[in-house]
Amino acid sequence: MKKIFSLAFVLLSALALASCSGNTETSLPDNAKTTTSTEKKEYTESIGFTFHYYRSDADYSSYNMWIWENGKEGNDYEFNDTDDYGAYITFSWNDWSANLKNGSINFIVKEAKAWADNPVKDVEKDRYVTFSSMEFSKEDGLYHIYLKSGDETVYGVKQEVGEEITKSQFNVDYDTKQIRLNIQTNKDVSLIEVKKDGTTIISTNNLDDSKVIKNTDTELIYKFDEMPDISSKYIISATFRETGKIKTAVASFANLYSSEVFNNNYYYDGDLGALYTKEATTFKVWSPVSTMLELRVYDTGTPEKITVNGKSVSLAGGNNSYKSYQMTKGEKGVWSTTINEDLAGKYYTYAVTNSSYKSLEIVDPYAKSAGINGLRGMIVDFNETNPLGWDDVNVINYDSQSLTVYECHIADLTSSTTWNGTASKAKTYQGFYEASTSYTSGNTTVKTGFDHIKELGVNTVQLLPIFDQANDERLETRSFNWGYNPLNYNVLEGSYSSDPYDGYVRIKEFKELVKAYNEAGINIIMDVVYNHVNSLAKSNFDVLMPNYYFRYSNGSASNGSGCGNETASDMLMYRKFMIDSTEFLASEYKLSGFRFDLMGLHDVTTMNELAKNLHDNVNSSITIYGEPWTGGTTTLTQNLQATQSNLSKFEGFGCFNDKIRDALIKGGLAAKTDKGWITETKKISTTTDIISGLIGSQTILGNDPYKTVNYVTCHDNYTLYDRIKAAGITDEETIKNMAVLANSLVFTSQGISFMLSGEEFLRTKGGNSNSYNASYQVNELDYSLKIKNMDVFNNYQKLIALKQNANLFARSKEECKNITINKNNDGSLIYFDLIDNENKFQYRFAYSNGYKSTASKNVDFNGFTLYLDTLNKEDLVLSSDTVLDELEVIIAYKSIE
């Protein structure tokens, strides 16, 4: 922590010391004009700058500034002192680089904590000041920058800060369990009154002393004997003593929402959504704060008009007519109504009224299908959605360590002209399972699409998001997007169906997809994004329960997702939603697992309960894993996050191992020129994280291979080909061999093995490292590359077959401790043995990187039979002194009977 003393204070101190010594002469800075004793000096050049910071609660000791120059490290700085505006901190130009006054300085105001402790930012945005666009004060030679808490604007002039109510919130005292209303002001008041729906219930002129916890000129803490009515509005008015002005504020309930008393009163563990039978449908929605809910039932999911990119678009066949039904508020804040008729195929919405929204129409968060663009939920009879033979479809219970996961986007598999399937089915669920497609070039024909995946041999496909996204689903206007913009979690995305207007079609076609893959021995894992929504404002969650479902930092949405908001899995009703949602999706669509985006934003308790529910109530072998990190700073306490550092707390789920990825190729956030063990050819690379990954990440991510997913590439960042090329490798043969070497280690490691679709033939996105909304062409699987790189494809086939069929990669954590990984003197060669006790084979694995080593790269393969040589050397003879070339993998086996 750096503390810079006030420049003004230093100057004044110098003058004071001079006076004490009897020396009355002083010298002014060279850039100040000489004046008489009665004139103020005037600065002709600036000497520094001052940040001024105002908080209505005057809590300056709890905050500091993080400041950095462009391209340099930052530091924490405490505020020097306070004045009539607030806290301030002053710097001399001498504290910074010589040219700073001609440039800019970056800053964050945050809680006075280390970054490792997840300090809350005053505003989420990183801000900066460009001095050349400002004027300095000629009175003191300083640029003055004025900041206000909660306001991201950077001001160049002093802002008005008047009398304010600085706190108006209900909370719970966790020692006494009392519910209290806490009111604070920044100036003395003569009167405070609280009105509930217009009726005065508290006045400082007539207080019930038995309920007063504290009463001063600037603060009132008042006890409530029971839970306040959270559907009412509590208006606080404060009359300020000095001016007589009256300020008002609405009391917030947000601090109650995580309390035991709130959960006792409002947590609901029953069914929610449209509960359908042919005789009647009951609608249930949780909204304790609302004063009115109206159910609207439509004949169609298509409105007369939709808004796309700010423009109104008319839809053929659209209809805005609906039947209206008033809902009744019951226990736990659940609103319900029952319609005694068969509503299958109808669509519905809720119109919600509370203190934040008036008759705003939303889709039920529990809706299970929808019409075009997810604007109206659908009432579904799921018995009408099952394809022939659906009852015979069952998730194949593979051991999770035998999983070979193939990550693919619905559109990518079929968007290339080289797919050669039915043109109308390209980019759709139907195209994803269309059989008998191929591509021919010259005299060579290769399988494409679904047949390509079957030929490759993977046993699991992980689909990029297929839930309903905030996209325009019209087939004639659809554009590519990864899909990390959630709209309706329990609804399938309509743009992948042949008819996005009919909520039944997407369900039927996706079930056909699952069935086709199941018949091919391939399970489906769904990528889920519960950590944020596309837009918090007017989202169905926020409309139903403002300030409950999301995390906040100083009144603004916390942005740990990097997408503008983050959901609060630690709030019991959102935890319930995640658990209910995954159970529905896994059960109805016969999914084998889930991949959680930015899982670090979810608390471990939620993930543990979710995993237990799926294992107990859906499938004991269901696979659950996620990204064990966040996308930014979150307000969720670090020891609660489902991140790598808390892996020992995970129960029934695992996470990606980015450590083996970075050790091999320096992926993720590394500079593109950084090199790993695979791509570094000129110096020795570390092997620690590689060895850890091979044995289930025992020493780094914990000692349980059932909790690790080993990989080198995924949809994020570069493809493997592009990543190697970005590191400066230009020779095509070298790139090919490096790519195969990287995934050879992945597919022969303990734990789940994961790959990005297309790596089996060196897929490229033309160097695009973030193709989330790039063109279909950038993201397509180009099957001409399969012909070009058939040797790569063949190597992947063998690696995948070995992973799945040899009894080598389902070791317990105790067994993994006994695996011995060997390497040569400089680590350019790694080799080890595994025993298949069931089939009585000993396998030997050897991997050589591209470092031109002077150390031995000899491995004893005497008596072994070759299974795989990734370089396909025609003259290779296994012996007691087999020499591996650079970038070569040799796998061989022998009988141990």
Tell what function each PLM region has.
Residues A16-S19:
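C-terminal motif of bacterial Sec signal peptides marking the signal peptidase cleavage site
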Residues S21-N23:
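Bacterial signal peptide processing site
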Residues E39-D57, D84-Y85, S92-D175, I213-K278, ...:
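The feature marks proteins involved in alpha-glucan
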Residues D57-S61, I183-S190, W286-M292, F861:
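Short proline/glycine-enriched turn/loop motifs at strand-loop junctions of beta-rich domains
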Residues L275-T291, N818-D860:
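Carbohydrate-binding surface patches
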Residues G345-K346, V877-E897:
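C-terminal beta-strand-rich structural cap/linker in extracellular carbohydrate-active enzymes
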Residues N373, G377-V380, E384, A611-K612, ...:
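Conserved alpha/beta catalytic core and glycan-binding cleft of carbohydrate-active enzymes
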Residues I396, H409-Y589, H602-N619, T623:
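Substrate-binding/active-site clefts of carbohydrate-active enzymes
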